Swiss-Prot record:
The keyword Cell membrane does not apply. This is Type 3 secretion system chaperone PscG. Disruption phenotype: Deletion mutant looses the capacity to lyse macrophages, indicating the absence of a functional T3SS. Its main location: cytoplasm. The gene is pscG. GO terms for cellular component: cytoplasm. Gene3D superfamilies: Tetratricopeptide repeat domain. It comes from Pseudomonas aeruginosa (strain ATCC 15692 / DSM 22644 / CIP 104116 / JCM 14847 / LMG 12228 / 1C / PRS 101 / PAO1). Belongs to the YscG family. Pfam families: Type_III_YscG.
Length: 115
């Protein structure tokens, strides 16, 4: 399958979860899993849960998470749940990331949390 189509469908599912089209987004996540696109599928599931206010369930995906790009979602869940110590640890880890986008996220979130 064309990778650009896979990417567009994953983006559609993310947008859909933000618009409360969770069932549809999860259908796309299941399809992506069948294609071996596990990171994209996991992102959609986490986004859908977080957009429903189900932060604890979304945070459960953090255990054994092999994809650093998903860590900001877990930080947001920890913030919503008031898990300050866990959030501090996660932001410290992200701050030391070799990925500048993750390090920037950590710095920005730290600044927001302090205000």
């Amino acid at each position: 399958m064309d990778t650009s189509l896979i990417r567009e469908l994953a983006e559609l599912a993310l947008a859909g979860s933000g618009q409360h089209c969770h069932e549809e987004a999860l259908c796309i996540a299941e399809w992506l899993e069948r294609l071996g696109q596990d990171e994209a599928a996991r992102l959609i599931r986490i986004s859908s849960l977080a957009n429903q206010g189900r932060y604890q369930e979304a945070l459960a995906f953090a255990h054994g998470n092999p994809w650093p790009a998903l860590e900001p979602w877990f930080a947001l869940c920890e913030w919503h749940l008031g898990l300050g110590a866990a959030l501090d640890r996660r932001l410290a880890g992200l701050g030391g990331s070799s990925d500048p986008a993750l390090a920037d996220f950590a710095a920005g979130m730290r600044a927001q949390v302090r205000t």
